Amino acid sequence: MTSHVHPETSGSESALNSPVEIFSAEWILTVDQNDTVLTESAIAVQAGVIIAVGPLADLLRAHPSATHQHFDQSVLMPGMVNAHTHLGMTMFRGLADDRNLQQFLDLVMPAEAAVLREQSVSVATAAAALESVHAGVTTALDMYYFPDVVVAACDRVGMRVMTGTTFLGSVGPEGRGGSAQMEWTEQ
C-alpha cells in the first residue's frame, strides 16, 4: 500500500481524533513523475488532509470506522491551479466577448470605473471562486483590485488565492495612485 502521512496530522491531537473519510473512484490520478493512474484504489482523508493513498481494500481494513464514498465512473485528482485570473471581472462576463484587446479595454474600463467598489469585487470574486472550485480549481493567482477583499472572498469559499496590489499610472478604483498605493502595499 502506498501511504503518505501528512506532517500536519501526525502531531496534532485534535486531527488524530478526527474521523477518517475514504473516497474512491474508478480512477485516481496521482500526478506523480510517472503519471500513475490507480484503479481499485482510494484516498483516506483526516481533518481535511490526505493521510493515505492506496488500494481500497487496504484503506478500508486500516480504517474500519471510516466513512466511505465511491464515485462511479469518476476521476479523483489533485486540485488544479489557475495561474492567471481576474476573478472580480466575472461581473463583466459577456460584455466584451470576441473583441481585440483595445476594443475589450474600451468597453470594460468605463464599466469598471462605474461599478468597481469593495462590495462589487467581493461578490463577483466569491461567485468566480465558487465556479472555479466547482470546476476543480483549488488555487488561483489573481490580478485585480482590492486584494484584501479578494483574499477574504476566496477564504469564505474555501479557495486558495495569491494576489497583490495593482499599480496603474493614475489613481485606481481603490482611490490610491503611485506612492500612496506603494505605501498601502508595504503596510
Where on the chain are the PLM-derived regions?
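Glycine-rich beta-alpha junction loops
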Residues: 87, 147, 168-169
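Alpha-helical scaffold segments that flank or form the walls of functional sites
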Residues: 93-159, 186-187
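Hydrophobic faces of well-ordered beta-strands that scaffold small-molecule active sites
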Residues: 79-85, 140-141, 161-164
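Short loop/helix-cap segments at secondary-structure boundaries that form the rim of catalytic
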Residues: 56-65, 152-156
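Metal-coordinating catalytic core of metallo-dependent amide/deamination hydrolases
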Residues: 14, 151-187
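N-terminal metal-binding scaffold of metallo-dependent hydrolase/deaminase domains
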Residues: 1-62, 75
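Short capping/connector residues at structural and topological boundaries
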Residues: 33-34, 43, 81-82, 92, ...
